[in-house]
Amino acid sequence: MDNTLQRLQNAELEILDEIMRICDANDIHFVMMGGTCLGAIRHKGFIPWDDDIDVGMYREDYNRFKEICKKELDSKYFFQDFDTEKNCGFIFGKIRKNNTYMVEEYAKEIEMHKGIWIDIFPFDYVNDDFTVFQKEYKKLLFLRNLFIVKQGFKVKHDAPIAVKISYSMVRCIRGLLSASSLKNKMMKLMTKYDDTKTNTMFPYGCAWKEKELISKDEFFDTIRVDFEGRKVPVFRSYDKYLTSLYKDYMTPPPIEKRNSGHDLRNVKFDKEN
């Protein structure tokens, strides 16, 4: 395995251990998502070529975790979201490792913490009617894109043409609303059903879109499985979850598609940001 990828995975495991320490000590429900869940089930650890870890939390737990981090998070790390760092354009959180460097191309010019990270996605209750959910999700995506452009983030170079066109359109109206107004509108929309508690939950910041919809019962029902020598929580219904995301998830992709998701050439370990 490439030494940089191995070192990156080890750094992320350190961050994961810190997240788990805080969650377990404070009875915070969390779960492995996406490729991290797949890696745990298929490889009992990282997918060999994977370079990130994704964690999910119910919004209420996410907010509690965020508050606890102010006092209990080890000084080696930093909790980042659009509240803790004004230039942040993400609608989810990250735990970053201080004195390291890893940045995605679209955020390269943004003045913010750029340490090695783990993503933490808050799950919110959403409308049980899929048609209504889709309308509200599209509205959220529009606001998110407007917010990202407002913060100075660039569109990914490999984004679909439709996405690039939408970003171009958004740039034309980015001056109509302030960043704080956009944050308030997004938060109001994302947490719209959190008090009424529907039967469906969703992580608005995720990459898999509607495929990540999950029932309330399935979200809170987890089991612990092996992951790089530690036990991590995954959905008990992981077969249903992973099939939705990857279909035949136990069959690895062809060799030519086994690529790291990020450019690892500029990753720095134990360096000042």
Annotated model-derived regions:
Residues M20-I53, Y62-N63, D217, S244-L245:
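Active-site nucleotide-donor binding segment shared across nucleotidyl transfer reactions
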Residues M1-D24, C69-D128, I148-L245, P252-N273:
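Conserved catalytic core of two-metal-ion nucleotidyltransferases
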